[in-house]
């Protein structure tokens, strides 16, 4: 019967929850992620180029960028509660994954720490002078994968 010939394109999507180790593996290579935070003008989401460094997410931004201005509170060791999202999707196959990291963002002040981060290879997304280094310390990591079920539902 024609209805029995299920292809990957017609299969129903399956959502799988990912454990923390799977999430860490997916984001370990670095790349582009999105930082979400409450800025001066309300909820804000911006793309940044990040790397994983010593179990944390690090990226660079400009001193006078919206993100840089929102994170510089004038209070030493201040932290901002943030969400950081990384994903990979395929419009063609309608499959992909996403990882959500929730935690606190801190400006990195220590020159030794900044030098260590530079060694990790983090480069700004937009290029140009990005003198602020931001570290996101995860308090919760979650993720999910969406894939097409194969014949027989699995």
Residue map of PLM features:
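Extreme N-terminal tail/first-helix region
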Residues: 1-28
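N-terminal short leaders/motifs
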Residues: 1-7, 42-45, 52-57, 86-92
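Charged, gly/pro-rich active-site loop segments
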Residues: 4-13, 82-154
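Short connector loops at helix/strand junctions that flank enzyme active sites
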Residues: 28-30, 45, 52-54, 76-81, ...
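Short beta-strand segments
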Residues: 30-63
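Short acidic/glycine-rich loop or secondary-structure boundary segments that cap or lie
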Residues: 45, 58-60, 67-70, 93-94, ...
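Compact nucleic-acid interaction/catalytic patches
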Residues: 53-75, 82
